[in-house]
Design a protein with these regions (language model features):
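Hydrophobic, aromatic-enriched interface-forming segments
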Residues: 147-166, 170-187
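Active-site beta->alpha loop and helix N-cap motifs at the rims of alpha/beta catalytic domains
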Residues: 2-157, 162
């Protein structure tokens, strides 16, 4: 039997580098100061759930910024009315919360309420770059999606990757919780 290596504090610190946490705007109202619970500069994703108000996202991002965190708001394409709303939302996120990174999602099975049908349609507007946002997360689905075929998911990721290269966006893929490492590694 192979001897296991003793885990050191340094090993634990290394394993927890560059991690992020996620919060809803409603849950954020229960936290007086995020710095009481998280190390400074922790990346905190701010969800965009069905029926949520963009003002709540802005306020949560602002609180996170004031508490020394890196707020990464989720922008759900199918929940946005039009480019004007997106432009105003980005303007507020940047000016009030110093946001420089966002996660663009389609919005799951949400009914499209405006001009954006998917995340790439948001990426194509050029509004992220206009507001100085060049680090952009997009959704990855290693275990598939009930809303989109596997082939369309693959094609969409390739399109987003090509757009990111063309537009100079620093794009990364963020996934939901995955419990089968083999699926993720094969993906």
């Amino acid at each position: 039997m192979k001897a296991s290596k003793k885990v050191t504090v340094q090993d634990i610190k290394k394993a927890t580098e560059d991690w992020s946490i996620e919060i809803t705007p409603v849950a954020a109202t229960k936290i007086e100061n995020f710095a009481d619970y998280l190390p400074l500069n922790t990346t905190v994703n701010v969800t965009c759930l069905p029926g949520s108000d963009p003002i709540e996202t802005i306020q949560t991002a602002e609180q996170l910024n004031n508490d020394g965190m890196n707020a990464v708001p989720h922008l759900a394409a199918r929940s946005l009315v039009d480019q004007l709303e997106l432009d105003n939302l980005l303007k507020e996120l940047v000016s009030r919360a110093s946001v420089n990174e966002v996660l663009i999602i389609g919005g799951g099975g949400k009914k499209q309420i405006g001009e954006f049908s998917d995340s790439i349609s948001v990426l194509r507007t050029g509004l992220l770059q206009k507001h100085g946002i060049t680090k952009v997360g997009v959704a990855g689905h290693p275990e598939g999606s009930t809303d989109i075929s596997d082939e369309r998911l693959k094609t969409a990721l390739l399109e987003k990757n090509e757009l990111a290269k063309t537009e100079g966006l620093n794009m990364y893929i963020e996934t939901q919780f995955c419990f089968d490492s083999e699926i993720v590694l094969n993906w």
